[in-house]
Curated annotation (Swiss-Prot):
Subunit text: Homodimer.
Protein name per UniProt: Bifunctional protein FolD
Protein's organism: Vibrio parahaemolyticus serotype O3:K6 (strain RIMD 2210633)
Domain of life per record: Bacteria
GO molecular function ontology, one term from the record: methenyltetrahydrofolate cyclohydrolase activity
Lineage: Bacteria, Pseudomonadati, Pseudomonadota, Gammaproteobacteria, Vibrionales
Biochemical pathway: One-carbon metabolism; tetrahydrofolate interconversion
Residues the entry annotates as binding NADP(+): G166, A167, S168, I232
Amino acid sequence: MTAQNIDGTLISQTVRSEVAARVKARVAAGLRAPGLAVVLVGEDPASQVYVGSKRRACEEVGFVSKSFDLPASTSEEELLALIDELNNDNEIDGILVQLPLPAGIDTTHVLERIHPEKDVDGFHPYNVGRLAQRIPKLRSCTPKGIITLLDRYNIELRGKHAVVVGASNIVGRPMTLELLLAGCTTTTCHRFTKDLESHVRQADVVVVAVGKPNFIPGEWIKKGAVVVDVGINRLDSGKLVGDVEYDKARESASFITPVPGGVGPMTVASLIENTMLACEQFHTEQ
């Protein structure tokens, strides 16, 4: 068997079109368009690329996008003061602070300062806690995007054994919670996991987010498994590859996300959905 590719570019465009229609309906009803504040500290080239794509996506769906590009010398106090200002701005529904932050700024302090109802990245402990208690509101963007992909492809998760490789706060941990919520029996693997291969070989669904090119050999993938590759790594040749050995894995898998064009576009689509949700649920009276 050869796996069917899960087309994240196509699904993300569908999600954006759905949000754009909701924005249009809001504006036609005399309500303001949703507003997203995007904060970038420093001049990290990769962060500038990510922020640019997020701002463009906002404008495409009709959001009001406010940009705050701060120098790398910005202090934590100055950044927290800006977040306080944005928390109190009634025309801002979502606040996104691009990570990583420069040395000297405590990321936890910054993320916890964002009001939970404006935390459209889904990183605030309150929102992660809601997901853990099975009452999610604003959900972490990449895991949410993955669940959307699987749902749009009608991939049944209930009763499946899902293995998540990687336990970061941004992907691995919230992904485990999302899969639990979807009815999976979940295993989370990390750097202390013994015999990673045996876990991956048992997986009906495997989600890999470690940031190491071709980290999971394709031969580990069980026949008929669903493979979600969150990694995006550039080889010396310039080629972009994921964390899973794609060509070999697709010989066994039933579905697989390609890199690029799989999970990546869905992260931004989820951010757009979260901002729309925050506007509709929390700030409708404005």
